[in-house]
UniProtKB/Swiss-Prot annotation:
Protein's organism: Escherichia coli O157:H7
Site annotation Seems to be a necessary countercharge to the potassium cations: residues: E248
Modified residues (Cysteine sulfenic acid (-SOH)): C286
Record protein name field: Betaine aldehyde dehydrogenase
Top-level EC class: oxidoreductase
């Protein structure tokens, strides 16, 4: 693909130049080519976007629930009509295989938007009787202008996960995509406008997180920030949001999730789940089950099943339908993952497979890392303690149920967890003891629109998806009505 035209900001229903004068490049990680130069939003641009959003939000919130629902449903239809076009752009920007982006990224994002479009008419208050002459009623009102700050691994899906409940509740959103993968969020803004969303209700500000993101978190005109990213960045976003104007926050942060295989499990099923929990999207999924706990007596057989499945990984032309494994999202990220792999070797973990740059026809210029499996791992190793966010699985052995529960919970993270077992009683007994917000039994990775997702401990605050997320984009107003004559003591 030839280099795209310079990308601008999207404010008040159209493209506009950034006042900052700064730009950055977005790179195709499959081959190292520059996709586009992108303008970076500065402080004045954030001010413009907030003013625009405030204007648009008043119009949007004044519409009836059914009017808002129809507009969002129209956007869903456009997303599905342009699925392949958007998936190709997502593949170019992220490096993910087209077989993945065309069946997951836009599809699941559109599902969430459709889900919230359907929930809009259900937003309602309550009536509380006090006595014969008095009652209270409540209203759920929008927060106003909210900000979404996205991560680079699922650009358009995250933009939809954040904007769908926010818009459904009557808010306007200013969205800052990751500077690594900014392109499809701009296309989403076009689609919202085409569907009939009032100008200003969804503005997109590409830019560097340390600048544009900070301006958003500090701006007094923004009522809430929803952030997806790393723990360290999330803590800064939360601190800035609270210090500036006590903003509400939703934080979807990192994980180092345990996948526990029990001795009664079907090892073929367990190996299939472990592969998806580590190598789907080249391991760049926040919920990945990178700590795979296996009974010591089953480990040798489990390792052989993993090796057999690694042979089925197909890296190569990301637009080939047979390719199921792409490069990492950027060269700096590739180098960081390689540093973790080197650390694993240094600390004594045994490389079962991979462990280096992936080379071959058409791969040499991209940010490729071989699917890597470490075994003979221990809990104190860096690769077991820290989030790598790449195609790196760590296999750990254990002897008892109590031991594996304790070790699985021995982490600052608490995003996800899963178990593989044939014993239903054990499944529920163990899953109830795991300190994680998203849990799976005999499966991994699905996050449907109806399912609240979010973490315990350092993995986040609040939830995305599900009914409760729609409510989190509202504030409750209580109104007392007195029908008898008011009595004053004065």
């Amino acid at each position: 693909m030839s280099r795209m035209a310079e990308q601008q900001l999207y404010i008040h229903g159209g493209y506009t130049s950034a006042t900052s004068g700064r730009t950055f490049e977005t790179i195709n990680p499959a081959n190292g080519n520059v996709l586009a130069t992108v303008q970076a939003a500065g402080r004045e641009d954030v001010d413009r976007a907030v003013k625009s959003a405030q204007q648009g939000q008043k119009i949007w919130a004044a519409m009836t629930a059914m009017e808002r629902s129809r507009i969002l449903r129209r956007a869903v239809d456009i997303l599905r009509e342009r699925n392949d076009e958007l998936a190709k752009l997502e593949t170019l920007d992220t490096g993910k295989a087209y077989s993945e982006t065309s069946t997951v990224d836009i599809v699941t994002g559109a599902d969430v938007l459709e889900y919230y479009a359907g929930l809009i008419p259900s937003l309602e208050g309550s009536q509380i009787p006090l006595r014969e002459t008095s009652f209270v009623y409540t209203r759920r009102e929008p927060l106003g202008v909210v900000a979404g700050i996205g991560a680079w691994n699922y650009p358009i899906q995250i933009a939809l996960w954040k904007s769908a409940p926010a818009l459904a509740a009557g808010n306007a959103m200013i969205f800052k995509p990751s500077e690594v993968t900014p392109l499809t969020a701009l296309k989403l803004a076009e689609i919202y406008s085409e569907a009939g969303l009032p100008d200003g209700v969804f503005n997109v500000l590409p830019g560097v997180g340390a600048e544009t993101g900070q301006y958003l978190t500090e701006h007094p005109g923004i009522a809430k920030v929803s952030f997806t990213g790393g723990v360290a960045s999330g803590k800064k976003v939360m601190a800035n949001s609270a210090a500036s104007s006590l903003k509400e926050v939703t934080m979807e942060l990192g994980g180092k999730s345990p996948l526990i295989v029990f001795d009664d499990a079907d090892l073929d099923l367990a190996a299939d789940i472990a592969m998806m929990a580590n190598f789907f999207s080249s391991g760049q999924v926040c919920t990945n089950g990178t700590r795979v706990f296996v009974p010591a007596k089953c480990n040798a057989a489990f390792e052989q099943k993993i090796l057999a499945r690694v042979e089925r990984i197909r890296a190569g032309d990301v637009f080939d339908p047979q390719t199921n494994f792409g490069p990492l999202v950027s060269f700096p990220h590739r180098d960081n993952v390689l540093r973790y792999i080197a650390k694993g070797k240094e600390e004594g973990a045994r490389v079962l497979c991979g462990g280096d740059v992936l080379k071959g026809d058409g791969l040499d210029n991209g940010a490729w890392v071989a699917p890597t499996v470490f075994t003979d791992c221990s809990d104190e190793m860096t690769i077991v303690r820290e989030e790598i966010f790449g195609p790196v699985m760590s296999i750990l052995t254990y002897e008892s149920e109590d031991e594996v529960i304790r070790r699985a919970n021995d982490t600052d993270y608490g995003l996800a967890a899963g178990i593989v077992t044939a014993d239903l009683n054990r499944a529920h007994r163990v899953i109830h003891q795991l300190e994680a917000g998203i849990c799976w039994i005999n499966t991994w990775g699905e996050s449907p629109a109806e399912m609240p997702v979010g973490g315990y401990k350092h993995s986040g605050i609040g939830r995305e998806n599900g009914v409760m997320t729609l409510q989190s984009y509202t504030q409750v107003k209580s109104i007392q009505v007195e029908m008898a004559k008011f009595q004053s003591i004065f």
